[in-house]
């Protein structure tokens, strides 16, 4: 028996030959140094309100092949966690896991009252403008990060 594996169409014709090569599993994107890029370092920088580190990590994410839209939704997730943490007294009142909740609670000291709501509004409005063709997600993410 050979290592060849044939894929046939409904007429019996061979359409693909796999010579025993393992298919690549989906792996995390790599940064310039060949390490796996950690997107949560970027969300931590957003929570810490460190605009320089957040922007640098954003550029690293783009260089690692992560789409701007994926980064955008991670930022939305972080802002949502911060808003939930700001409106609750403990993790029991939420559907969140204890670790992200405690991180969000610790990041709340970096934001004044109303700033999270404004940031959330800017993200939502900017996303819809970009979807209508009135801007780009890449530019929106960059503006949001630099306005922290």
Which sequence ranges carry the predicted segments?
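Conserved beta/loop motifs at nucleotide-recognition and modification sites
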Residues: 1-148
């Amino acid at each position: 028996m050979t290592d060849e594996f044939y894929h046939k169409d409904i007429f019996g014709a061979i359409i693909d030959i796999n010579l025993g090569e393992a298919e690549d599993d989906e792996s995390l994107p790599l940064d310039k140094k060949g390490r796996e890029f950690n997107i949560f370092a970027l969300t931590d920088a957003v929570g810490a309100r460190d605009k320089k580190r957040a922007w640098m990590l954003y550029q690293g994410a783009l260089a690692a092949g992560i789409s701007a839209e994926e980064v955008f939704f991670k930022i939305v997730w972080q802002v949502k966690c911060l808003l939930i943490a700001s409106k609750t007294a403990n993790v029991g009142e939420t559907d969140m896991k204890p670790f992200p909740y405690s991180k969000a609670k610790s990041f709340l000291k970096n934001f004044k009252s109303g700033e999270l709501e404004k940031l959330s509004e800017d993200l939502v409005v900017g996303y819809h403008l970009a979807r209508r063709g009135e801007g780009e997600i890449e530019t929106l993410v960059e503006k949001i990060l630099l306005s922290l």
